[in-house]
């Protein structure tokens, strides 16, 4: 009898594949929109924290109404620095305000997809987006991929560049470091290829080091056979 595939084991939800979210700092979301729609909140950065679940550090901010929130830290933020959230916030690094209020050519990050959703786009370490143009019913923003995306003018964004840039510039060099990078988020690593396995472990396995059968497989194949190009319309390089 064959062995279970990795995706079959993952589907059981054991601790081997479960994210260690109990170690994460917590959710990073903007202050609810109804609290800052008509006013601007002032806060002070209490501390800057490392978050194992993110590629960027987070900052804990205490606001004047007594609430504390985690925000994605921008480059250059300092402990004790004042930040503002609201439509009348000044144009300065770390401040959050609607895209309609941000001038063209400004670097922003943590952009809301829908007004009030708390921030969805451009949150990874070292990333930033660029406000390209503002119109009456939309704001055009260039994302890190180069894509130009239109946002609702009431979507909020934070001014600046996400901290933690340059983390990919230092080479990993040895497998032991890659192991600990994966372990921090409980990633299944290393992940062997099917053709490198024995025939008992994978449909593509065996000593011949080639699949030995078509790599395409039916959408209705049983779980232990459903590997390769699933219900593929075409395979191979486009010519």
Swiss-Prot record:
Q: Which GO terms describe its molecular function?
A: RNA binding; rRNA binding; structural constituent of ribosome
**Species name for this entry?**
Thermococcus kodakarensis (strain ATCC BAA-918 / JCM 12380 / KOD1)
For this protein, the parts annotated as crossing the membrane are none
Q: Which gene encodes it?
A: rpl2
The Gene Ontology biological process terms listed for this entry are: cytoplasmic translation
Question: What protein does this entry describe?
Answer: Large ribosomal subunit protein uL2
Q: Which residues form a coiled coil?
A: none
Q: Where is the composition biased (Basic residues)?
A: 222-239
Disulfide bridge positions per record: none
Q: Which SUPFAM superfamilies match?
A: Nucleic acid-binding proteins, Translation proteins SH3-like domain
- Sequence similarity: Belongs to the universal ribosomal protein uL2 family.
Q: Where is this region: Disordered?
A: 200-239
Q: Which InterPro entries match?
A: NA-bd_OB-fold, Rib_uL2_dom2, Ribosomal_uL2, Ribosomal_uL2_arc_euk, Ribosomal_uL2_C, Ribosomal_uL2_dom3, Ribosomal_uL2_RNA-bd_dom, Translation_prot_SH3-like_sf
Q: What does this protein do?
A: One of the primary rRNA binding proteins. Required for association of the 30S and 50S subunits to form the 70S ribosome, for tRNA binding and peptide bond formation. It has been suggested to have peptidyltransferase activity; this is somewhat controversial. Makes several contacts with the 16S rRNA in the 70S ribosome.
Q: Which GO terms describe its cellular component?
A: cytosolic large ribosomal subunit
Give the quaternary structure. Answer: Part of the 50S ribosomal subunit. Forms a bridge to the 30S subunit in the 70S ribosome.
């Amino acid at each position: 009898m064959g062995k279970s595939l990795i995706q079959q084991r993952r589907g059981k939800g054991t601790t081997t594949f479960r994210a260690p979210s109990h170690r994460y700092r917590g959710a990073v979301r903007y202050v609810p929109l109804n609290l800052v729609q008509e006013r601007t909140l002032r806060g002070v950065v209490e501390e800057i924290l490392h978050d194992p679940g993110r590629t960027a550090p987070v900052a804990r901010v205490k606001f004047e109404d007594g609430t504390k929130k985690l925000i994605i830290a921008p480059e250059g933020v300092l402990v004790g620095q004042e930040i503002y959230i609201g439509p009348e916030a000044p144009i300065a690094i770390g401040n959050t305000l609607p895209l309609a209020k941000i001038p063209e050519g400004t670097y922003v990050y943590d952009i809301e997809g829908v007004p009030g959703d708390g921030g969805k786009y451009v949150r990874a370490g070292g990333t930033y987006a660029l406000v390209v143009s503002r119109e009456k019913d939309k704001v055009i923003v260039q994302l890190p991929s180069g894509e130009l995306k239109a946002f609702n003018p009431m979507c909020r964004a934070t001014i600046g560049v996400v901290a933690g840039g340059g983390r990919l510039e230092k080479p990993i060099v040895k497998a032991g470091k890659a192991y600990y990078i994966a372990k921090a988020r409980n990633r299944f690593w290393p992940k062997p290829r099917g053709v490198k396995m024995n025939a008992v472990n994978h449909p593509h396995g065996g000593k011949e080091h080639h699949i030995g059968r078509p790599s395409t497989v039916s959408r209705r194949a049983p779980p232990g056979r459903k590997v390769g190009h699933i219900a593929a319309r075409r395979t191979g390089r486009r010519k």
